[in-house]
Amino acid sequence: MAKGEGNVIAQNKKARHDYTIVDTVEAGMVLTGTEIKSIRAGRINLKDGFAQIKQGEAWLVNVHIAPYDEGNIWNQEPTRTRKLLLRKKQIESLDNEVKGTGMTLVPLKVYIKDGFAKVLIGLAKGKHDYDKRESIKRREQDRDIKRTMKAINSR
């Protein structure tokens, strides 16, 4: 399967609005049993999350996975830091990009692929307010063009 394909559980739509996504990387997550059950139930929130690289390892920070209802004592803290599974070269290249150009790593979506939970991490650059307004104008213009083309073609 290509990057990002699978049973999509959660998406971070706010990230696409606030950031310009330059590149994406698929990563596995180190989870406990109750966390994967909670993710399969769709109880995950990516909105405030980000990824960072510390001492040659990638970590997913501030992603909220709700406690599993039947988890009892095996439930973990909902916003704990989770390790991301990437190859060493991928980690090094992401680290160089983040340190060199002032970009950040944001989770774009979580999905189940071949029975494993994967997260699509985006290498992103923050947008200014005027960039956001420009994106909205461009999107509205594209919609208007499509509407007029559809009206012309349906005659």
Swiss-Prot record:
Entry keyword ATP-binding: no
Keywords in alphabetical order, please. Cytoplasm, RNA-binding
Swiss-Prot/TrEMBL GO biological process terms: trans-translation
Listed SUPFAM superfamilies: Small protein B (SmpB) (SSF74982)
Q: Which GO terms describe its cellular component?
A: cytosol
Chief location category = cytoplasm
Q: Where in the cell is it found?
A: Cytoplasm
GO MF terms held by the record: RNA binding
Which cysteine pairs make disulfide bonds?
Answer: none
Q: Does the keyword Cytoplasm apply?
A: yes
Query: CDD domains given for it?
Result: SmpB
**Purpose:** Required for rescue of stalled ribosomes mediated by trans-translation. Binds to transfer-messenger RNA (tmRNA), required for stable association of tmRNA with ribosomes. tmRNA and SmpB together mimic tRNA shape, replacing the anticodon stem-loop with SmpB. tmRNA is encoded by the ssrA gene; the 2 termini fold to resemble tRNA(Ala) and it encodes a 'tag peptide', a short internal open reading frame. During trans-translation Ala-aminoacylated tmRNA acts like a tRNA, entering the A-site of stalled ribosomes, displacing the stalled mRNA.
Q: Which family does it belong to?
A: Belongs to the SmpB family.
PANTHER family, alphabetically? SSRA-BINDING PROTEIN (PTHR30308:SF2), TMRNA-BINDING COMPONENT OF TRANS-TRANSLATION TAGGING COMPLEX (PTHR30308)
Q: Which HAMAP family match?
A: SmpB (MF_00023)
Record's protein name: SsrA-binding protein
GN (gene name): smpB
